[in-house]
Structure formats: structure tokens, C-alpha cells
UniProtKB/Swiss-Prot annotation:
Native source species: Homo sapiens
Function: Catalyzes the GTP-dependent ribosomal translocation step during translation elongation. During this step, the ribosome changes from the pre-translocational (PRE) to the post-translocational (POST) state as the newly formed A-site-bound peptidyl-tRNA and P-site-bound deacylated tRNA move to the P and E sites, respectively. Catalyzes the coordinated movement of the two tRNA molecules, the mRNA and conformational changes in the ribosome.
Taxonomic lineage from the root: Eukaryota, Metazoa, Chordata, Craniata, Vertebrata
Cross-link for Glycyl lysine isopeptide (Lys-Gly) (interchain with G-Cter in SUMO1), residue positions: 239
E.C. number: 3.6.5.-
Effect of substituting residue 715 to L/M/N/Q: Confers resistance to diphtheria toxin
SUPFAM superfamilies (UniProt xref): EF-G C-terminal domain-like, P-loop containing nucleoside triphosphate hydrolases, Ribosomal protein S5 domain 2-like, Translation proteins
Annotated residues for binding of GTP: 26-33, 158-161, 216-218
Family matches, as InterPro entries: EFG_II, EFG_III/V, EFG_V-like, EFTu-like_2, G_TR_CS, P-loop_NTPase, Ribosomal_Su5_D2-typ_SF, Ribsml_uS5_D2-typ_fold_subgr
N6-acetyllysine: residues bearing it: 235, 239, 272, 275, 439, 445, 619
Protein name, as recorded: Elongation factor 2
Family that this chain belongs to: Belongs to the TRAFAC class translation factor GTPase superfamily. Classic translation factor GTPase family. EF-G/EF-2 subfamily.
Outcome of substituting residue 596 to H: In SCA26; compromises the mechanics of translocation
Compartment annotation: Cytoplasm; Nucleus
Amino acid sequence: MVNFTVDQIRAIMDKKANIRNMSVIAHVDHGKSTLTDSLVCKAGIIASARAGETRFTDTRKDEQERCITIKSTAISLFYELSENDLNFIKQSKDGAGFLINLIDSPGHVDFSSEVTAALRVTDGALVVVDCVSGVCVQTETVLRQAIAERIKPVLMMNKMDRALLELQLEPEELYQTFQRIVENVNVIISTYGEGESGPMGNIMIDPVLGTVGFGSGLHGWAFTLKQFAEMYVAKFAAKGEGQLGPAERAKKVEDMMKKLWGDRYFDPANGKFSKSATSPEGKKLPRTFCQLILDPIFKVFDAIMNFKKEETAKLIEKLDIKLDSEDKDKEGKPLLKAVMRRWLPAGDALLQMITIHLPSPVTAQKYRCELLYEGPPDDEAAMGIKSCDPKGPLMMYISKMVPTSDKGRFYAFGRVFSGLVSTGLKVRIMGPNYTPGKKEDLYLKPIQRTILMMGRYVEPIEDVPCGNIVGLVGVDQFLVKTGTITTFEHAHNMRVMKFSVSPVVRVAVEAKNPADLPKLVEGLKRLAKSDPMVQCIIEESGEHIIAGAGELHLEICLKDLEEDHACIPIKKSDPVVSYRETVSEESNVLCLSKSPNKHNRLYMKARPFPDGLAEDIDKGEVSARQELKQRARYLAEKYEWDVAEARKIWCFGPDGTGPNILTDITKGVQYLNEIKDSVVAGFQWATKEGALCEENMRGVRFDVHDVTLHADAIHRGGGQIIPTARRCLYASVLTAQPRLMEPIYLVEIQCPEQVVGGIYGVLNRKRGHVFEESQVAGTPMFVVKAYLPVNESFGFTADLRSNTGGQAFPQCVFDHWQILPGDPFDNSSRPSQVVAETRKRKGLKEGIPALDNFLDKL
């Protein structure tokens, strides 16, 4: 079964310079799981004959049936580099054996939260791109996430077999395709990265450096320029030079790699390289990449697929490929697979690329520490993370929960950043809401067991030092989704993950048999644990709501809930979309509210944000934790706020981080600081449940203009001020032309040219609009990009397929919030219907409350 034991893995875990934590990320159906198979089979876990078909990391039954990856799965591999290859590693190393912790992640945008969880615990990423369809929208999303987490990418061009067999491209066309993909990826990296001066240095990918692989996961072959450079160096060396030492050889190979890509040409007549495209005699020269690398591959494909027996035999002998006796009788595709797999095994090429170019925890934690750790950059925990010190205090981040075979229990899955985690160790378990010095969200408990994750299997292990990925048993009751585990008393939390999608689609669920309600509640708790993205909410009306990223995501969640977590039959409502409330103009009057005892008065106005500010707050560019002056400067420069006002921001809301702002622009009010907390509490309450239909507010700035307070402290307590503040905020919203915002998907559709018309028809029916269409160069495919309201997206995929004969593939990503046109007070408009439906669903009074309820007269 496995070629190496847990003891061997444990021995390597201590050599932290020889660990690689990496995840495989890509657009949906570009072949991540298939490619992972070639790596796994190299480590001897599945038979090489089955690699490419097993999809070992798709552990769930529904993953195998649907042929998609849903959860990210971890697996540890052992790989030994040869003496010659070790010279290519530019960072510190310790022996020739490497431990590679690989996480296969899903490509569907609905599961992109799983990708985020995978990225947090890894330092490098293998970005897989289908060389036929190129860089797609999801490739860009996951790559952007990786770069934001300071994770170093290497690229793999997958599905080369399709380019050769289906599209029948010429070598030069294929080179141009590759060149274009490399450029596209580098554009994304340079747009979102920190440049060469950043802490990571240059992370651009470049075939010359060997950070780009080419191959086919399904057929199990792959190469980087390094493999071919080595063949040619050996070939030229055989012609007369003596044996080279490993270091000189590495130098020669690196020089050779530079000649194999870009505008370098090869003259077959005299075997010389040249930089011009024409030879001295005026003949057009072939590009080196085409002549020396693609040409042999094309020859093998041609000979085998056209059944040229003698030529095939010659080629096999010339390339020195040793076939098994059973492979010799094959012909056509099976023979092609066997030959290519022998000549350019994918496992070796990729594992070499990973070990040589991706950073070890020692290298990576130096520059990732400031992004990971919330506390001061010089306390013990931070120093331990920076130096990846096994003797430092234990700091471990749990990025997700993995369900066990035992119903209702979970493994906590995460990575040790500093220290050593062992069975029976007593630790502090800190949830995401923990603040140092307080007791809430903190538990002191021993760890029952530490385990090693191996795809479908788990192996018990005594202790695990820093830099490794591990599962823990016995902490699942104390954490919901993520958290920090430490032994250091003054430790702060590891930073919470930022998801690129937000849960905007909701369904209400109830048990078919009312007696099963307790099971449903228990099941919902487990569901919330097992998926990083899902939110389970109980409405005031007693409904149980599940919020997810999209239709597919919710479908999987409900299936899990029914079959695994609650084990009862469930009824579900139609999907509902969350809306946001906002304002479109400044309040037309200064709104006044009096406190219940008539002794205190608040005056406020509301006005909309400038464009882009709400998005900046979502991204974390502007936040409550920022340094005051820095934030004021940013707001003044980018959004032309008054600097004095920008410095007097009281808070953000809802939840202290949301996209609404409360500013104090009063002049010389007595006792103002005493009521600040009460006004802030009222503001959090009002922005969480807006005036129109109790949805969150978004993009509203409230200004406190004036406050008159009673001189006696007893008459201006929280009970007087909080409700007053809320009424005043509602009044200022209702006088500022309130509007509803709806979430919008960005849809990317790939299709052949002849069905583009059908797509336009479907989008127009669903209030969508196309903003870009382009042809994928070198293929007959078109890419259409459009905006589509989430509300209209249910059943969109099925509709699209039936109108285009199943030739169009849509991919929906939540993109932005957009104002629903129309006035909610006008009974015939769309927003007023939405408000009425939402209020009815939530069990509120009919109709938007009248302004008189909130506005007082002097």
C-alpha cells in the first residue's frame, strides 16, 4: 500500500527546511484532482496504471459521482531528490528526502471558501491551467487569493493531449498559446502582488527558471524545461567532454534552459543556437522550444496515433524508453500513454518543480508572519512563527473542520506555525472572537490525539513539530469553524480568513415531522462546523435559515444536512436572496429625535458613500483597526472627505466592521463622550436591521450634527439614548431617498460561436447584460462576460443549456451590490414588492413604517 511508514514521515517532519506545504488550485474542470493522482502515484499510494482515473483525493461518494471536487483534501507525500537536482534549490536544505503536504482544492466558485481554507495552511500553490481554454475567471480569483495570502505560485499547463489530438495545433501555434497563458498569469501576479521590492521578491513565473510545467494529467506525463535541458546537456556531454560534477552540471543545465524558451532559434544544419530567426544562408530557422522540445513529442504522437510500427520502434529505442512486456503489444492511445508516461513521468517533473521552487516553512513564515498574526510583531509568538521554531510556544491555526466516520465528531484540520503539538498537551483554544485578557471564546483543554491526514485515511502520530499540517481530535466541541490553538498565555489570534465570495442565497428549512426539530437544530450546528462558508441563522419568526454562496453550494449543504448531519427528511423553501438597504441622496431635513423622557435630543443626517468606499471597507483597505491618521489621510486623498471629519469616525457597522460609518461633526457638546457608547450601540442595531425591511444597511454615512443632553447623568443612561439614536438614524435614512441594493453575479460563459445568440436571449430575459465578449485565441470558443442579478440566477444554468444545446458552460461569481432601480415608496415599483415580500416573510407589519414614528417636533 504505502511505501513509507509514519515513523519515516515523523523523522522528516523535524527537517523543517525539507517540508513543502502546497495546494493545487485552478478553474473548475482544468484537471486538479487528475493531476494530483500522478503525484500520489509517484509516492506509491495508488497503482500507476490507475493514475489519472482514480481521483484519489475525491473522497466523498458525491464527488466521485458528480466528477467534481467539493471539499479540499490533504495528503502527505515523501519524495527523494537525486544528488544532481539538489543543486537547483536556492534556499536552505537538509538531506535529500522531502515531505510534501499536498492539498487538492475544489475549482467551483461555490466552494471557493474551501480554497481559502486550503491556502491559509500552505506556502506554495500549483496553479493548473487548461492550455486549450486558457486563464479563466476562477483561475484569476484563486490566484488573487493566493497572492493576497503571500503564497508563491508555480504554473502547470494541463491537457496538452487535447491540444495535440483534438485541436491538432502546429508547434509554433502551441508555443504562442503557452506564451499567452504565461503572460496572462504574470499580469494577474503583477497586478495583485507587491512587486520585486516586496518581502517575497520576484514571484513572476518564467519557463526559463523552471517554474512552468507542461503536460497531461490524464495521460500521466509532464515536463519542465529542466527535464529537456538535462537530456540535451547529457547528449552534448557524451560527445567528448568528461563527466561533470553535480554543481557544474547544474550550471550547464541552467544555461541550457535559457536557450529553450523565447525568441531563441536552432539551426539543425550545424547544431548551433542563434538569436535571429534566419540563418546566415537566409533560411527561416525553427524556434528552439518547437524544434528541441515539441518536435520529439509531436513525432511520438504522430507515429503512435497513425500506427506507424517501424517508426514507433525506432523512436522508442532512440529515446531509450523501456516498456514492460504487456505494454509492447498495445497500440493507439494505450501505447501512447505507456510511452509518454515512461519517457516523461508527471510525478517526477511536478515533484521536482515543487521541491525546487516552492518555499519551505522556514522561508515562507518570515514574510507571512505579519499577515498571519494579529498581535505585536515582536512578542514570543510572533518570533516563534517568524523563525519557525519547534522550541517556541505552540501557535497553530485551525482552518477547517473535517467530519469523521463517527457521526457528529470532527477532526480539527490546521497547521502548526511554531512549537510542537503532541497528544495530551494542555492548550488554550481561542475562537475568532477572543480578545487577549478576556475570558470569552477561550477554553483550556488537553488535545486527545494528533493524527496525520492521508486522503481517505488517517494515521495516528505522537507529536508534530512546526511547519506541518495536522489533524487534532478532541477540540471540535470548542470551535465552530476556525480558531487558534496555543500554549502562550499572551498570544493574540491568528488573523481570520477573508473569503472572496459572500453567502447571498438563503433557504429556509424545517423538519417534515415536527417531532424531529431537536435533530434538525443539532444537524444545523454540525453543518455550520463542516463548511467554512455556510451561515445557519434562526430568524425571529423561528425559521431556520441556511445561507450559502450559490445554488450548487446550497444543494450540497442540504444533501449533507439530510444524509449526514441531521439524518431526517427535510422540507426546504425556494431560495431567497439577501438585499441591502442604502440611501441615494443627503437627508433633506436635519432629523431630530427626543429620548423617552424628553430631556435629550439628537440631530442627525444620512448621506450616501462615494463610489468604491463600501468595497474598500469590504476588502479591509479601510477598517476600524487602522491607525487613525493614516485612515483619515486615505479617505481625504481618495474620496475627498474633510480631514477633520475623517478623523472623527466613531465606528463602522454592523458588527463593528461593516460598510456604514458614524461620524461626529458636532461642535463643543458637553458630556458627549459619556453617551458615545450608547449612540454606537444604537447605530450597530440600526445598521443591522434597516428601516425598510430589517435587512443590513450598506454604504450609508451618518453624521451626528448636534446633541443636547440633560445635565444630570441619571437622565441620560443607555436606556434613554440607545432607542433615541436608533429612531434618529431611521428617520435620517427615510428622509434621504432610501433604496434597496441587490447582489449581482459576474457570469463567464464559454461557448462555440454559433450559440452566442442564444446566450443573449437568456440573459435579456433575466435582466442580465453582457459587458464583454472575446474569442479565445487559437480556438473556436467565445467567452461572454455578463452581469446577472442573483435573484434571477436560479435555474439559469439549466435554461442556458437548453437554449444552446448544452454547449455553453456558465460560471457565476458574486461580484458586487447594485441599487435596484425604483422607489420603495411607490407601490408599483420592483423594490416595493421586494420590501413587501421580505416584511411578510419576516413576520413584520405590512408597509414601510411612517416617518412620524421616528421624527420628533421641537
